[in-house]
Amino acid sequence: MSNHTMLAVLAHPDDESFGFGATLALYADSGVAVHLVCGTRGEAGTVRPELLNGHASIGDLRWAELACAAEQLQLASVTHLGYRDSGIDGKGGEGTGEMPVLAAAPLEEVTAKIVWHIRRLQPQVILTHDP
């Protein structure tokens, strides 16, 4: 068993699969503790109502899909940063009082949350995508 740690920092559920799912799975399978920090729950996506499969919202569906993907990819943990998705145009508004929109959040605030996870996990490798 390896004592190495990898951290993926991504914006939405499904970024882990579309972006570099095979890489995450490869390292997890080799014994690396692979963790994911996800900025949003993907609430601004679209899905036909009949495809919600009993989930109360798109965010709930997307988070459930992420949980399934995390299991298949053998991720050690998945953490939500506490932001709402803004949508593809980045104009998702101010968010709710409980959950601000990631695209509108102060850079210093988002950075501090990510740095907290980096310090907690102390990964040797961090993967992310461009803004």
Task: Report the location of each language-model feature.
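Active-site rim/loop-helix segments in enzyme catalytic domains that contact anionic ligands
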Residues: 1-120
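Extended, charged catalytic domains and RNA/DNA-binding interfaces, predominantly
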Residues: 119, 123-131
